């Protein structure tokens, strides 16, 4: 039996799994956002660490992320808007809603995520940079 990808795309094996396994990089900011959502849903801690730069020591980030990642059950992702972030862009934003369940209570996380290219170069992969304030 084939599993659907949590991001709402296609089959996991042909959608976000190749990104999580490091077989390819996200071609767009939206694809990185979707793959990060799937990584949260599936507990792919290393992928989340690799796709978000931070001055915080890696061991601490890994420990904190591993402790928090199982507290929510991610239900559904809805992309609301995408600005730039294409194959020929250096930055872009993705606004989304991520629906979740926490101890039997349903919730929705809304965010506008800023993405940029590592090294500010088209030859480099996309990274999650920060959450922007929603208007």
Predicted features along the sequence, with ranges:
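A broad, low-specificity signal marking well-ordered, structured residues that form hydrophobic/aromatic
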Residues: 5, 77, 92, 113, ...
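Short solvent-exposed beta->alpha transition segments
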Residues: 50-79
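Short, low-complexity N-terminal intrinsically disordered segments enriched in polar/charged residues
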Residues: 1-35
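Short, charge- and proline-biased low-complexity linear segments
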Residues: 30, 64-69, 128-135
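Short beta-strand edge/turn micro-motifs at domain boundaries
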Residues: 107-135
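Short helix-adjacent coil turns
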Residues: 36-47
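Generic secondary-structure microfeatures
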Residues: 19, 52-56, 81-83, 98-100, ...
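Surface-exposed, charged secondary-structure patches
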Residues: 68-105
């Amino acid at each position: 039996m084939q599993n659907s990808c949590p991001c709402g795309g296609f089959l996991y094996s042909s959608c976000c799994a190749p990104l999580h396994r490091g077989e390819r990089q996200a071609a767009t900011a939206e694809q990185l956002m979707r793959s990060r959502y799937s990584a949260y849903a599936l507990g792919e801690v290393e992928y989340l660490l690799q796709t978000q730069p931070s001055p915080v020591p890696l061991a601490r980030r890994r420990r904190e992320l591993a402790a928090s990642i199982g507290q929510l059950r991610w239900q559904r992702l809805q992309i609301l808007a995408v600005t730039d972030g294409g194959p020929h862009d250096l930055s872009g934003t993705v606004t989304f809603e991520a629906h979740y369940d926490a101890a039997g209570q349903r919730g929705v996380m809304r965010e506008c995520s800023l993405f940029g290219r590592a090294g500010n170069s088209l030859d480099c992969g996309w990274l999650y940079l920060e959450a922007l304030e929603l208007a």
